[in-house]
Amino acid sequence: MELKLLQADGQLGTGVSASPEVFGRDYNEALVHQIVVAYQANARSGNRKQKDREEVKHTTKKPWRQKGTGRARAGMSSSPLWRGGGRIFPNSPEENFSQKVNKKMYRAGMRSIYSQLAREGRINVVDSLSVDAPKTKLLADKFRAMGLDSVLVITDNLDENLFLASRNLAHVLVVEPRHADPLSLVHYKKVLVTKAAVAQIEELLK
């Protein structure tokens, strides 16, 4: 199969040969959903904290005697039943949100994403992508000429100039093939891949 070559002026050129084993698979929506959710879960860190009945400020003094008052018995003011008491099952920063995805499933999901991008025409190939200096304007002008605003760039050689020039562009992410993640692939409107990176992607997902 072929992927369309995107020229510097935004016009589509001749096709670039690509492996149907990676870019010609059927779309498995359930599998793609699973690996995207797992990626987000594994990137999540615990940032919630609630106090249990040991951690809230309290006294161990019994509020009133056990019998004879007519009120329900109570042991101490930190009871979860009381206002200001501790939580029964409090949220903790040590919570583990990670989800395991087998390598075989992950690679199959990534192939499914790349194939769907190719079918939708959202993935294009460029000969190479570089800038002469680490200037945001230079890279922004290149993307403007190509008609791109939200783009994930997968390059075989992420040099310092290209990395620094892309950092300040809000809707641009430049990565190497091994760092392309499922969330970024489905998030950005367009995916731009250098010719050499196509071969690297095929090698990673074969």
Swiss-Prot record:
One of its GO terms (biological process) is translation. GO terms for molecular function: rRNA binding; structural constituent of ribosome. It holds the Pfam family Ribosomal_L4. Keywords: Ribonucleoprotein, Ribosomal protein, RNA-binding, rRNA-binding. SUPFAM superfamilies: Ribosomal protein L4. Residues 43-78 are annotated as: Disordered. Residues 49-58 have a biased composition (Basic and acidic residues). The keyword Transcription regulation does not apply. Residues 59-70 have a biased composition (Basic residues). One of its GO terms (cellular component) is ribonucleoprotein complex. InterPro entries: Ribosomal_uL4, Ribosomal_uL4-like, Ribosomal_uL4_dom_sf. Belongs to the universal ribosomal protein uL4 family. One of the primary rRNA binding proteins, this protein initially binds near the 5'-end of the 23S rRNA. It is important during the early stages of 50S assembly. It makes multiple contacts with different domains of the 23S rRNA in the assembled 50S subunit and ribosome. Part of the 50S ribosomal subunit. This is Large ribosomal subunit protein uL4. It comes from Ralstonia nicotianae (strain ATCC BAA-1114 / GMI1000) (Ralstonia solanacearum).
